[in-house]
Amino acid sequence: MLGAGGAARAIAAALCEAGVEHLTIANRNLDKARDLADLLVKELGFTAVSAQPLAQTDGADVDMIINSTSLGLHADDALPLALDHVSKHTVIADIIMVPADTKWLQDAVSRGLPIHYGRHMLDYQIDLIGRFTAAF
């Protein structure tokens, strides 16, 4: 997973609770990645987690890469991660909703990689809000 902010925390917790085998948190600020990894150990007892600098991440040998950074919100943003070393079966997911087709997802499609759009996150949030507000 790329990023260690608020959205990354929620996604990391959901992945751990869903039974992910291992989670690597890569972030520009290594201390923030380590803090999130430590939180997952402390609060969820999930120990198959590691942290590493984003600059040292190549995406090789993983099943999914989730961009939970802000990279991709603006047309001139750099790609969150080059996809040169990614397996053809690696799912590329982006939480950016606008634009829906970020440069990163476009790059993944051009390489024939499976992708997952950020819009799905909003759809589930709307569903949860609807259920929550209907309870009152």
Regions found by a protein language model. Name each.
Residues 6-7, 70-73, 98:
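Short glycine-rich anion-binding loops that position phosphate/pyrophosphate groups of nucleotides
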Residues 75, 82, 88-136:
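Rossmann-fold NAD(P)-binding glycine/threonine-rich loop
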Residues 13-17, 38-42, 106, 110, ...:
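Short, well-ordered alpha-helices that flank and scaffold nucleotide-derived cofactor binding pockets
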Residues 44-55:
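Rossmann-fold cofactor-recognition segment
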Residues 1-2, 25, 94:
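Hydrophobic Val/Ile/Leu positions in short beta-strands of Rossmann-like dinucleotide-binding domains
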Residues 18-44:
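NAD(P)-binding Rossmann-fold cofactor-contacting core
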